[in-house]
Design a protein with these regions (language model features):
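GST-like fold's C-terminal all-alpha helical module
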Residues: 75-173
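Active-site-flanking alpha-helical
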Residues: 51, 145-146, 179
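Phosphate-coordinating loops and pocket residues in cytosolic domains that bind phosphorylated ligands
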Residues: 23, 171, 180
Length: 187
């Protein structure tokens, strides 16, 4: 969209590693987005907000387009269905102290993630992007879920269509800009 922005990368999880972060964001989660007096913490909501407020943009699917419902479903599936189980894998394999790690919980949620990932495999069998015949913020959101999976080594379970879709996303200049930061800083 060509918007100017400032990004601050913090060691994860910032509520424990960044003094004063909960004074700014009481729930202590990332992302935390501000636009004037607007403060938001939900990734999909932030994307939807930006596309709606600063559009029109082809990154959004309009209410009058046939794939509008599909677009919203993918946009919100990214966090609620695809990213959520990965947060438990992250917690119980990396973030918790060694004595509190639960490999069986992590393994169960990794299986859950891979089962939910079938929807991406099916959706990308006959199309380049998830909806509306073009790249949208739904692809950005699902792309993050795939990126997190790759970071957690869950990408070993990706099927052929998902692999090809993820490769298309990674080839985009915006993806490359967004992932310039050392992933070790972010996780």
């Amino acid at each position: 969209m060509g918007l100017e922005y400032d990004i601050e990368v913090m060691k994860f999880p910032p509520r424990f590693t960044q003094p004063g972060y909960t004074d700014i964001n009481p729930i202590g989660t990332v992302p935390f987005f501000t636009d004037g007096h607007v403060e938001m913490t939900e990734s999909a909501g932030i994307s939807q907000y930006l596309a709606s407020k600063y559009g029109p943009t082809d990154l959004a699917v309009g209410l009058d387009e046939p794939d509008y419902g599909l677009y919203l479903n993918w946009l919100h599936r990214s966090d609620a269905t695809l990213t959520f189980p990965q947060t438990l894998v992250l917690r119980y394999t990396i973030l918790e102290p060694e004595e509190k790690r639960l490999p069986s919980v992590a393994a169960d949620y990794a299986k859950w993630f891979h089962a939910r990932l079938r929807s991406v495999e099916e959706a990308t069998a006959d199309r380049e992007f998830l909806c509306a015949g073009r790249f949208t913020i739904a692809d950005i959101a699902v792309g993050y879920a795939l990126y997190l999976a790759d970071t957690l080594r869950l990408s070993e379970g990706f099927k052929p269509n998902t692999i090809a879709y993820y490769e298309r996303l990674k080839a985009r200049p915006g993806f490359q800009r967004a992932t310039r930061f050392d992933s070790a800083q972010m996780v």
